[in-house]
């Protein structure tokens, strides 16, 4: 049947057979095959291959016979498959499964060359068998011993192409759904491969150790011998394997190393601890009988966790560990040996060129032990210095820049050395930009060349040390999310959760590893240096950003510095590093015995001080002799002779005419600070006699017209009141020095802060700076809106008064409103009700009464003794001016002249306030005289004037039994009106009332049964029995109690 028979195609389509039977071969194709067989049986032509020439001809004929037999069998199999196809089309799907299983059991004879090619596979149906047959035919033709020189037969090739075209036409003409159904039937029931899975994928939780696994014990060994101990254990296991002493140890390993925290231990796995003791007995460098540590099951996986060993490459940055002089110094790798055990590095040397070497002793040994003393600073090697100090020890070539000094190699100023890898720190190097810049090589044009690639490689691990806080603005600079900008929300280990603020992912929260992040700043941000840099704690404004480097302008020195962004953080404060040890900014320090300086800059290791001559000097803290404490009482004189003190504002009158506030005064030099001066942190120095005072602290204003003290205040003649104006209040004297209002407790009387309590911190002529207690803030308030309070009692006080105390009310002046002493008709009540508030003592409050006056004038009078005598010249005090003795009194006691009276007569109304006073024009004023003229009121004052009444005896002045009568003669006068008034009856009654009396109701005395001792023995002078003696009463003198 022809392969192009349409009926055959229709039958195949109706029977849903996708693979039709092979078409019959034409005569020409059969002839071609026959000729092909004949050529296969004929001897193959010789070629250049030796293997083909040596092959026997008999074996070739045998192979040809086998090929003929195999082709005949293939034709028979093809016919059987054709019959099977017809049968399968008529059977049901269940029978197809049985036929498939039978087809699996059929065996075919292997073709020649099958041992070298995997060309056979089991199939589920005859369709696939037919495909395998075609594949076998192609492979058979492929391995046929055809010689390249044979003429290619195009007939067979054309047949195969026609067959391929026919199959493609069938596939293209078939409906897609029908084709899918055929494929489902063909491959749907295939079960080959089911149940086979990738056994290599095992959950990690199944690999974790459990209680059924052997235990791991940590056994101590000699440090550095961990690996040798493990090899010894494994060797012993191999030697005793299969013997009666076979070890029960299953494994042994170590995790030693220079930086390892587990060095000094070997870890042995066994079921029992006795197995380990038996296996390690008599082994060197291991101590099994010491305390062994059982490793917990949860800690076992950590013992097997392997960390990647960092590899060194030329150009990488490392830090030295040895020698101790260079411990921690940054170095750059030049080359690494092939075995990876040593590296050649270059670093900045620390040489003193023998300046600290002591002279050799007699035996030729050094006196100073090696390693003592501070480290020399890092400086590039100098051939000139070396030749100057020790010319014998230097050798080299100036043209190449290579030198040998004290058996050390130097190239281009750097020291070069071969160092073991164990003596280097290769992780977390974190080089600062300043350190790396010192390694930069100079180009011909003078610019610096920096190996940014090597620097980035070294900083890759150091980014893990960067600190991120919630709120930091960060940027992803590497990885798939490169360019994403967000704000840090949470930091967990080495992962930062950020909320995206820019880009397509706005509002989303993503997790980014710290190594892929860097902080982002904008020009104008106020930042602070926080990382490991010499500029640490500097504060400034961002002025330039380039990649990961940020340039800021410092607030303190107004200089530009460049640091990495990871070393910055946004700052809200203004200022910089203010202290280094015990020295702070603007401290006055002693530089040498004759020179002082003010600290104007503080670095990490040094200070910059502006000396008294205006020269800045950079010094180490160890070079400073001591710190001079600030003397708040220091005083200097300006060019006009006015006093200037700390915090006064002055201005130069020559030169630059700078103005500033005084921060230090040292002899004739003053150090000033000005916010307008940008040099030396705003500090400058000048001489005191070269400035004018602008404003003094506390409101003092010194000008050329008013300089020096007020000499008029020292002339008492100018203080007299003329033309009867003695009652007019004298204006407060001009204050000198510190304002009295400073540090006083005040209450605000007006304004928005009315009623609030505070402390005055600073004042001017009209205003005061008050620090409030409640709101913790300082405000400016006019002085007339303040009421000054006593901080202990809370009473209102007058800070401008210079007089005595105004009674027990706590006033500092001469009695104010409500502080009159004593009261009228109250028996010594304080204050007087309704009296003149300015007069002390007030009208009608005579203290003491007539019977207690001392000394006596006109002693024969029953009115008692007057104090002081009439018209005396020593009356004190002036009612208008503190406690000043009246001018012109002459100091007489007593005195008759009226000029010595205080106040001078002439004002009848004012007589009542004179102490004492006599002869006032107003008769009622006599009640205010002390003692009153012609009044016999006892002490305390009774309402009656009867000298024989009990008032003079009922409440005598308290005192001990004859030990302290009141008042004593000559040595215990009656207290003055200002210094010790008699307490009032209501607020402070006189104790010791006896048998009632006229004064008992107004001034009751507790403990009526306890009269004042010594009543009859020491009565108050001036009693009614007779003229009292002065000094002394009629009774006995004082006696001391034993």
Swiss-Prot record:
Protein name: Transcription elongation factor SPT5
GO molecular function terms listed in the Swiss-Prot or TrEMBL record: mRNA binding
Gene Ontology cellular component annotations, sorted alphabetically: DSIF complex
Subcellular location: Nucleus
Species in which this protein is naturally found: Gibberella zeae (strain ATCC MYA-4620 / CBS 123657 / FGSC 9075 / NRRL 31084 / PH-1)
SMART domains linked to this entry: CTD, KOW
Compositional bias per record (Basic and acidic residues), positions renumbered to this chain: 1-10, 157-177
Assigned keywords, A-Z: mRNA processing, Nucleus, Transcription
Family: Belongs to the SPT5 family.
